[in-house]
Amino acid sequence: TGRIAHDDVVIAMNQVTVQKDIDYLKDGGVLFYADHLELPQIEKDIIVYPMPIKALMKTVDAPRNMTNYLENMLYVGIVGQVMGIPENVLKATIDHQFSGKPAIAESNFNIVNLGYQYALKNIEKKDRFYLEQLPELSDYILTDGNNAGALGSLYGGLQFCAWYPITPATSLVESAIGQVS
């Protein structure tokens, strides 16, 4: 499938783009937004979920240089809960993302869980959207671009790779390393 013209669900975290975010929403869509943003007049039939990102972050002892990143993890918990993603699935996903770094995985999950628990106690679901786990399909491969590129490189004969480890290509190379380890 290709890019669709309008979105069913949007997460708005940026004042500069919030109008465009709303413009891309379909009627009947859902807007999650950081409640410190000033929303423009909304003329669509959409469901709006404010997220108290800044207020919740004040309850967390986090390094200042990590605040923006952790705010994103916070909304993962809020949106995940409202969309019906089980908490253990979020935990497993974070553990996988930060495999080999258990302290980082735990600190990220603690922030996700804060958002999850907030939504569980404070947000009444009003929309029709849910994310469900699909049954396992043993005849198909489901992957992302980095993993697909890594596998293609390896099966294509890659024998040597050099890169600077903070470039955007790092994820692709780390995927290749994971495949040969």
Task: Describe each PLM feature range.
Residues T1-G156, F160-A162:
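Active-site cofactor/cluster-binding pocket
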Residues G149, S153-A176, V180-S181:
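Extended, hydrophobic alpha-helical segments in both membrane/secreted and soluble proteins
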